Amino acid sequence: MKLVLVVLAFIALVSSVSCTQTGGCSCGQQQSHEQQHHPQQHHPQKQQHQPPPQHHQQQQHQQQQVHMQPQKHQQQQEVHVQQQQQQPQHQQQQQQQQHQQQHQCEGQQQHHQQSQGHVQQHEQSHEQHQGQSHEQQHQQQFQGHDKQQQPQQPQQYQQGQEKSQQQQCHCQEQQQTTRCSYNYYSSSSNLKNCHEFLRQQCSPLVMPFLQSRLIQPSSCQVLQQQCCHDLRQIEPQYIHQAIYNMVQSIIQEEQQQQPCELCGSQQATQSAVAILTAAQYLPSMCGLYHSYYQNNPCSSNDISGVCN
């Protein structure tokens, strides 16, 4: 916009100068023409009309000055335009330099950050290595301490195991004695019919065959039915204990009835064996179990010392 305004001003000045020149020329021509037509009349005024050439010279000088001034102004404008053109170039150069400096700074910052990251990684790896080495040393020391204590531990452990085994055996013996004792199963008195069946020396092996052949039931058959009924009322895991306690009660009663001279004799032993042998077939006679010694912890006891 500045350039356009300057050009318009310059054109206006040129047009004004041209107009003044044309006006001056017309005036001069008119004066000369009048002088030619009126040479005599206006002759005395020639001296008076001499100054106009000076005026014409002044006008020419002014016109030259006016013409020079626009030229100077135009030159100044061109210089100003060149300066304005140079300024954007200078600004562009400055911007490029700033941009390059920013890139250099960013590159330096990235390099610095990368170097810091490498240093941190190196420090972390070094710390981890130190921690691992410390843990390994601690483990080695702990293992050495364990190795020193290992020779003493097996002896103590073996002694503790032996004590625990002895305690377990003692507890098992106590449990077995309580199980096989007479008072362990409180419902042994419910087997009165089985008790009477064995006292009358009824054979449980023979009874199944006699049931099909005898027309009238004998006392042993009646006791058999009642004994089986009593056994079915007892829980299965307590049947053998109840039978064993019943046999012990029978043997004690016989010992009380017999004189003490026969205690420990062969006759008493045989009677006890016969009772036990008959008692072991009571479950099979009733269809409960096949053998008295099956799952019976008390059947392995020695009956040689029953008469003490």
From Swiss-Prot:
GO CC term (a single one): plasma membrane
GO MF entries: nutrient reservoir activity
Keyword Cell membrane listed: yes
Species of provenance: Zea mays (Maize)
Renumbered residue ranges of the record's region Disordered: 27-159
Membrane topology: Lipid-anchor; GPI-anchor
UniProt feature, compositional bias: Basic and acidic residues: 120-129
Domain of life: Eukaryota
Composition bias type Low complexity, residue spans: 55-119, 130-159
Recorded family membership: Belongs to the gliadin/glutenin family.
Subunit (UniProt): Interacts with OP10 (via N-terminus).
Cross-referenced Gene3D superfamilies: Plant lipid-transfer and hydrophobic proteins
The keyword Glycoprotein belongs to this UniProt entry's keyword annotation: yes
Signal sequence segment: 1-19
SUPFAM superfamilies: Bifunctional inhibitor/lipid-transfer protein/seed storage 2S albumin (SSF47699)
Purpose of the protein: Zeins are major seed storage proteins.
Protein localization: Cell membrane
InterPro entries per record: Bifun_inhib/LTP/seed_sf (IPR036312), Bifunc_inhib/LTP/seed_store (IPR016140), Glia_glutenin (IPR001954)
Assigned keywords, A-Z: Cell membrane, Glycoprotein, GPI-anchor, Lipoprotein, Membrane, Seed storage protein, Signal, Storage protein
Residue stretch(es) of the prosequence: 287-308
Protein name: 50 kDa gamma-zein
Residue positions bearing lipid (GPI-anchor amidated cysteine): 286
Pfam families: Gliadin
